[in-house]
C-alpha cells in the first residue's frame, strides 16, 4: 500500500479523480484501476505496480489513453508526463494482510476481508480444501494455455490472487468440454494455497437447485443460505441450467447479492454469454455483466497437441509426437473427447501388447471420429443401446441393483454418456435415478482403468460406441 505522506500518493489521487470523471472508464475498468499501486516518479515517468499480467495488459491497452489524458491534466509541478507498469504479484497478497481502507480513500472497490471459519454449531462447516468440492486433478499446473483460452486463464489467476478486487463476478462462457470447469477448480485450489482459511465452495447449478429444493422440503432454509453465503469464493458451474427455474433463480439472486455486497468473489460458467441467457430476468443478467466476461474457444492444433502431450505425461503414457499430432488433427471438437481418444488408443495398445503407431491409431479412430456438430447423440439412445447390448432393461440401469452385471453395464452407460454427449456430471447422474455426480465420476474413472486391463471391457465399450454412432447415422436400432 502506498504511503499517503509520499508526494506520489497525492499525484495518484489526482489521476484517480480525473479517471473517475472520464466517461470512457466503465465500472469494469475501474475495477482494474483499483488494483494499481503508485510507486514513484522518475524522470517524468509515474511508475505503477499491478498484481498480474492481465491488469497490466488492460492498463496498457484499454486504459492507456484515458490514463495519459489524466496525467496530462496534472500541473507542471507534478513533473509527470508518462507512466510505466511493473508486475508485482505480492500486491495481491498484501491486500489481505491489511485492513480495508476507509471508503473515502478507496474510491473504486473495497478490499475483501478473508475471515477464518467460526465455530457455530448452528451452521454447516465452512468449506476448506476437503469439503469445498474441488477436484484435485484440476489445477492451473495441469491447464494447457493457448490462444483459445489465454485471457480466460489470466482472468482466473487474477481472481484467485485477489478475490473480489476487480473482476466480480468473473463470467466464463463457451461450449462444453473446453476447460471452464477446470478453471473453476483451479481458482479454488490456487486461492486456498495463497490464503489459508479462505472459504471456497464449488457447485454445479444442478446441485444448487437440488439443495434449494431439499431445503424447502426439509424446512432448512437457513442451512441452505449459510452453505452458499458463508464463503469468500463461490464457484458455480453451468449457470444456464437455472434458466426457467424461477424459484431457484430467486434464491441464487439473493445469494449473489449477499456475497457481492460483502465483497466476496463469485465466478460463474455458462455455455452462453449473459445477453443470450434469455431464461433469466434482466436484473440477473445485468449482474452477470457487472464484472469481467470472457470466453473459451475450441483449441487450435498446437494447443490440442500440447493438451495430448500433457495428458500423456500425467498418465505416464509413451506416445510418439507424430502420433499425438495425428490425433490432434482428427479430433477437433473439445478437450474432453481429445483426452478420451488418447485413453482409448493407449488402452488398445496395452491390451494388444503393441506399440502405439499410425496404423493402430487409425484402427481405433475409425469408430471414434466425432459426428458433425449438428448431429448430436441423445443420452437416451446410449442408455437404450447399453441395456439392449447387455440384455437388460432400461429400468435395470436406472434402478438400484448392485449385481456385478448390472453395475458394470450402468457404469459403461455413464462412461459413454460422458464421452459422447455434452452433459455435465450432475446431469448424467440425474438420468440414472438421480445419482450423485460423484457416482458418475467414479464410473468414468473405473471404466477408463478397466479398459486398459480387461480386453472384454475394452471390446464392449468399443462395440457399443460403434453401434450407437452407426445407429445415429443411419437411424436404425
UniProtKB/Swiss-Prot annotation:
It comes from Clavibacter michiganensis subsp. michiganensis (strain NCPPB 382). Plays an essential role in the initiation and regulation of chromosomal replication. ATP-DnaA binds to the origin of replication (oriC) to initiate formation of the DNA replication initiation complex once per cell cycle. Binds the DnaA box (a 9 base pair repeat at the origin) and separates the double-stranded (ds)DNA. Forms a right-handed helical filament on oriC DNA; dsDNA binds to the exterior of the filament while single-stranded (ss)DNA is stabiized in the filament's interior. The gene is dnaA. Residues 1-87 are annotated as: Domain I, interacts with DnaA modulators. Residues 87-132 are annotated as: Domain II. One of its GO terms (cellular component) is cytoplasm. GO terms for biological process: DNA replication initiation; regulation of DNA replication. ATP binds at residues 177, 179-181. It is found in: Cytoplasm. InterPro entries: AAA+_ATPase (IPR003593), Chromosome_initiator_DnaA (IPR001957), Chromosome_initiator_DnaA-like (IPR020591), Chromosome_initiator_DnaA_CS (IPR018312), DnaA_C (IPR013159), DnaA_dom (IPR013317), P-loop_NTPase (IPR027417), Trp_repressor/repl_initiator (IPR010921). Belongs to the DnaA family. This is Chromosomal replication initiator protein DnaA. Domain I is involved in oligomerization and binding regulators, domain II is flexibile and of varying length in different bacteria, domain III forms the AAA+ region, while domain IV binds dsDNA. Residues 112-131 are annotated as: Disordered. One of its GO terms (molecular function) is ATP hydrolysis activity. The keyword DNA-binding applies. SUPFAM superfamilies: P-loop containing nucleoside triphosphate hydrolases, TrpR-like. Residues 133-349 are annotated as: Domain III, AAA+ region. Residues 350-477 are annotated as: Domain IV, binds dsDNA. The keyword Nucleotide-binding applies.
Amino acid at each position: 500500500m502506498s504511503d499517503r505522506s509520499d508526494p506520489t500518493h497525492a499525484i495518484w489521487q489526482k489521476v484517480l479523480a480525473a479517471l473517475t470523471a472520464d466517461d470512457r472508464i466503465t465500472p469494469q475498468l475501474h475495477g482494474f484501476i483499483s488494483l494499481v499501486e503508485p510507486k514513484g516518479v522518475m524522470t517524468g515517468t509515474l511508475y505503477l505496480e499491478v498484481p498480474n499480467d492481465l491488469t497490466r495488459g488492460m492498463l496498457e491497452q484499454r486504459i492507456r489513453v484515458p490514463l495519459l489524458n489524466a496525467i496530462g491534466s496534472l500541473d507542471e509541478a507534478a513533473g509527470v508526463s508518462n507512466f510505466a507498469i511493473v508486475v508485482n504479484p505480492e500486491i495481491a497478497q498484501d491486500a489481505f494482510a491489511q485492513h480495508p481502507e476507509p471508503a473515502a480513500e478507496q474510491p473504486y472497490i473495497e478490499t475483501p476481508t478473508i475471515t477464518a471459519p467460526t465455530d457455530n454449531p448452528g451452521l454447516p462447516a465452512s468449506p476448506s480444501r476437503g469439503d469445498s468440492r474441488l477436484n484435485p486433478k484440476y489445477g492451473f499446473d495441469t491447464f494447457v494455455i493457448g490462444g483459445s483460452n489465454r485471457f480466460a486463464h489470466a482472468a482466473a489467476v487474477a481472481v484467485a490472487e485477489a478475490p473480489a478486487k476487480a473482476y466480480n463476478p468473473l463470467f466464463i462462457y463457451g461450449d462444453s468440454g473446453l476447460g471452464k470447469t477446470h478453471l473453476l477448480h483451479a481458482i479454488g485450489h490456487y486461492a486456498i494455497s495463497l490464503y489459508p482459511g479462505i472459504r471456497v465452495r464449488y457447485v454445479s447449478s444442478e446441485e444448487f437447485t437440488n439443495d434449494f429444493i431439499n431445503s424447502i422440503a426439509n424446512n432448512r432454509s437457513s442451512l441452505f443460505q449459510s452453505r452458499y453465503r458463508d464463503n469468500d469464493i463461490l464457484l458455480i458451474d453451468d449457470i444456464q441450467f437455472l434458466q426457467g427455474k424461477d424459484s431457484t433463480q430467486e434464491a441464487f439472486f439473493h445469494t449473489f447479492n449477499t456475497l457481492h455486497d460483502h465483497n466476496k468473489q463469485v465466478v460463474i460458467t455458462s455455455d452462453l454469454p449473459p445477453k443470450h441467457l434469455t431464461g433469466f430476468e434482466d436484473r440477473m443478467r445485468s449482474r452477470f455483466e457487472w464484472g469481467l466476461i470472457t470466453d473459451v474457444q475450441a483449441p487450435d492444433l498446437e494447443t490440442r497437441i500440447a493438451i495430448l502431450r500433457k495428458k500423456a505425461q500425467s498418465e505416464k503414457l509413451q506416445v510418439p509426437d507424430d502420433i499425438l499430432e495425428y490425433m490432434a488433427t482428427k479430433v477437433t471438437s473439445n478437450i474432453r473427447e481429445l483426452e478420451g481418444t488418447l485413453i482409448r488408443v493407449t488402452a488398445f495398445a496395452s491390451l494388444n501388447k503393441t506399440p502405439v503407431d499410425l496404423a493402430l491409431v487409425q484402427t481405433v479412430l475409425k469408430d471414434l471420429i466425432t459426428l458433425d456438430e449438428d448431429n448430436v447423440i441423445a443420452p437416451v439412445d446410449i442408455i437404450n443401446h447399453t441395456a439392449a447390448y447387455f440384455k437388460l432393461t432400461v429400468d435395470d440401469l436406472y434402478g438400484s441393483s448392485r449385481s456385478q452385471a448390472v453395475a458394470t453395464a450402468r457404469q459403461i452407460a455413464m462412461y459413454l454418456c460422458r464421452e459422447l454427449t455434452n452433459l455435465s456430471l450432475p446431469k448424467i447422474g440425474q438420468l440414472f435415478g438421480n445419482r450423485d455426480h460423484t457416482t458418475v465420476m467414479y464410473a468414468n474413472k473405473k471404466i477408463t482403468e478397466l479398459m486398459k486391463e480387461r480386453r472384454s471391457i475394452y471390446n464392449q465399450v468399443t462395440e457399443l460406441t460403434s453401434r450407437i454412432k452407426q445407429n445415429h447415422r443411419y437411424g436404425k436400432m
